[in-house]
């Protein structure tokens, strides 16, 4: 759905973003999406966040030759400091600062390792320190932390044109707002739904546009 009616988010990104976009990606995982951004937008600047050792090292090895990528070993969160990551095997990509609930039964094959302390940074603080004054798109895949990160960084979010976010259709992690509540929260801060991609019963992705920019 959505006014752009595109079936491929990557095609949409190429057509809609400027040649030199500022991109924030949280949940970099192995860096494959980051590398795509860096290749497609050599004049842009991509800031990526991945807090866990194994995926961070994989992403670093994939991305260290891109001059337009800044990779930070942090999780985004409401407050800067230490956080507890509920860690699973890296291949599952399901680790979260949120305690897993429904995902334990919905995805029983995921191997959960335990709790790991990670560094957490508030996005507004990061952008202030790094002189980031506007963002063309945020690309958020954070296993339930997306809403909290957005709501806790109102300054840079208000200066962000698009947010592409993972969303929950059922509770997979503790305390995560489900799709309709999430969309309501986004509408309150000036973002409307452009496009929904909801192929699974548990989670999907939604593209939001800041109607004030």
List where the protein language model places each region.
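Phosphate/nucleotide-binding beta-alpha loop and adjacent structural elements of enzyme active sites
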Residues: 1-213
């Amino acid at each position: 759905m959505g006014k752009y009616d595109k079936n491929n988010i990557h095609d949409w990104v190429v057509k809609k973003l400027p040649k030199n976009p500022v991109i924030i990606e949280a949940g970099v995982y192995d860096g494959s999406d980051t590398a795509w951004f860096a290749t497609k937008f050599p004049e842009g600047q991509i800031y990526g966040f991945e807090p866990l050792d194994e995926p961070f090292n994989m992403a670093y090895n994939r991305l260290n030759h891109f001059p337009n990528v800044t990779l930070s070993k942090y999780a985004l969160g409401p407050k800067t400091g230490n956080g507890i990551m509920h860690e699973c095997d890296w291949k599952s990509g399901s680790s979260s600062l949120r305690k897993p609930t429904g995902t334990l039964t919905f995805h029983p094959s995921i191997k959960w390792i335990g709790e790991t302390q990670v560094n957490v940074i508030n996005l507004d603080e990061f952008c202030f320190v790094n002189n980031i004054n506007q963002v063309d798109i945020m690309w958020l895949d954070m296993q339930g932390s997306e809403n909290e990160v957005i709501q806790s960084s109102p300054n840079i979010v208000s200066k962000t044109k698009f947010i592409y976010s993972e969303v929950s259709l059922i509770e997979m992690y503790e305390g995560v707002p489900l799709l309709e509540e999430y969309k309501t929260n986004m509408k309150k801060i000036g973002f409307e739904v452009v496009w929904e991609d909801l192929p699974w019963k548990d989670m999907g992705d939604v593209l939001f546009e800041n109607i004030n920019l």
